[in-house]
Design a protein with these regions (language model features):
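Alpha-helical transmembrane segments and their immediate juxtamembrane cytosolic regions
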Residues: 1-350
Length: 350
């Protein structure tokens, strides 16, 4: 890639691709939940946690990817790189707005991720010390800002389709995804990329924190204490932190395996996750389109529909793996690269 093209290309890094693959797998499972209204409680518990990890994990990997782009861009070209990131964010917003009109039951995340990229990418020009400070501040302010917004921005609901209301939803009011809660994971992803994917004290600390953070919300819910555990609250954020930390630790530990036998097993597990991770945006668009065709109007099945579940989860994954194996770059990823001046070859080098 020429210097004029912005970010300089380089070899793909395994851990972000695998994490992105886990995230798209989690999102597929979460969006296929309505196909199994009669699922047992244990399975519902598992699927609830899978649903909870999907969006913060996507934000984490987006931060890693944005940091990779920043590091591979010459300082003189970083202004152009930021422009490319803004264009990419705007395209994600536009694609997300279009997909909300398709009539699926999915709460579309792409517009939220577009806003996240536009806001988060410039912050990655900060030094690591200042980025840690900003991350801590965003974490600390997220819950009170969300609570304040719910109490004081009621006017936004008077015109739910208006631009001011839509922006408020993206930033702070949505019951599903909010900039205030996705940005900490984005910045954390960048910091982890800077630190490196090492099995060190930081990794083991994350492993120790994960179950404790995850337990806060269910403990408060079971204790029926007068504490806010709604989406965007501190307990809810800690719950997501626990899930994301555990996922990250498992992937990094497996990626660091060096013994020949276990390495082959890990490689076999990682390959399909890496494959669908590199095509995550295309697969996201594909599965929402299939859901819109399968259940027009977003009407949930009254009984278990195993065929629908199989089409959306393993079916989408199989399409993604085969495309990656025999073609290469996902079609939406290819179009996004062309539109932002970071063109990728459609066919994967053999």
């Amino acid at each position: 890639m020429s210097p004029q093209s912005g970010a300089v290309g380089g070899p793909r890094i395994v851990v972000p691709d695998v994490l992105r693959g886990v995230a798209i797998l989690a999102m597929l499972i979460a969006h296929a939940v309505p196909f199994l209204p009669g699922a047992p409680s244990a399975l519902n518990f598992l699927m609830d946690n899978i649903n909870d990890v999907a969006s913060p994990l996507f934000a984490l990997v987006m931060g890693m990817s944005a940091q990779i782009v920043t590091q591979r861009t010459a300082r003189a070209q970083r202004g152009q790189m930021l422009f490319q990131q803004v264009v990419r964010g705007l395209l994600l917003i536009a694609l997300g707005l279009w997909m909300t009109e398709w009539g699926s039951w999915v709460a579309i995340v792409l517009s939220h991720l577009g806003v996240l990229l536009i806001v988060g990418a410039p912050l990655l020009l900060l030094s690591t010390r200042w980025l840690v400070v900003v991350t801590a501040a965003v974490v600390a302010l997220g819950a009170p800002v969300n609570e304040w917004a719910r109490s004081n921005l009621g006017w936004a609901y008077s015109d739910p389709d208006g631009p001011a209301s839509t922006l408020a939803q993206w930033v702070v009011l949505s019951t599903h995804y909010r900039l205030t809660n996705l940005l900490p994971f984005f910045l954390l992803g960048a910091l982890l990329l800077r630190h490196g994917f090492r099995r060190d004290a930081l990794l083991w600390t994350m492993l120790a924190v994960a179950p404790l953070a995850w337990l806060v919300r269910p403990a408060l819910e079971r204790g029926q204490l007068a504490t806010d555990v709604s989406s965007g609250s501190y307990p809810d954020t800690l719950h997501d932190v626990g899930l994301v930390f555990l996922t990250y630790v498992v992937v990094v530990v497996l990626a660091g395996v060096r013994s020949p036998g276990p390495t082959r097993v890990v490689a076999a597990v990682f390959e399909p996750l890496r494959a669908v991770g590199t095509l995550a945006l295309s697969l996201y668009v594909l599965h929402v389109a299939m859901l819109a065709l399968w259940a027009p109007g977003g009407v949930w099945p009254a009984e278990n529909d195993l065929l629908g579940w199989l089409v959306i989860v393993p079916g989408t994954l199989a399409i993604g793996y085969l495309w990656w194996r025999f073609v290469g770059t996902g079609p939406v990823e290819w179009l996004m690269g062309a539109a932002t001046g970071r063109r990728k070859p459609l066919r994967r080098p053999r």
